[in-house]
């Protein structure tokens, strides 16, 4: 993982994308299940974002995947992660930053 500096706006954008992953996946599943008439461009864009995040998840090791699930799917803060799994604050934020960096790399931002 490179130490490339990324603008704060870009970092916030990709962090928001990671938090919206589960919601976006549910929206796409609903559209497909109901066979709604939706804009094809929007469906493709949503599908591409979901695939990129799934690629990021596949690059993580098992511990990081577990922490990823706690952070982005269960919306657990650092203190909860420390209490439940004894995850250090630096580890918590390192995993967040690693996911953001990998997602930016997948999107071609870096």
Question: Can you say where each PLM-predicted feature lies in the sequence?
Answer:
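DNA major-groove recognition helices of helix-turn-helix
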Residues: 92-106
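A short pre-motif secondary-structure segment
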Residues: 67-68
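Helix-turn-helix DNA-binding module
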Residues: 74-91
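N-terminal interaction/assembly modules
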Residues: 1-59, 107-110
């Amino acid at each position: 993982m490179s130490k490339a500096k990324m603008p704060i706006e870009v970092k916030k954008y990709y962090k928001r994308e990671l938090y919206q992953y589960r919601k976006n996946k549910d929206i796409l599943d609903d559209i497909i299940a109901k066979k709604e008439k939706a804009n094809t461009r929007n469906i493709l864009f949503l599908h591409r974002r979901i695939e990129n995040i799934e690629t990021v998840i596949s690059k993580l090791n098992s511990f990081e995947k577990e922490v990823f699930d706690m952070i982005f799917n269960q919306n657990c803060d650092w203190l909860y992660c420390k209490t439940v799994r004894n995850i250090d604050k630096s580890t918590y934020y390192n995993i967040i930053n690693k996911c953001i960096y990998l997602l930016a790399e997948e999107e071609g931002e870096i």
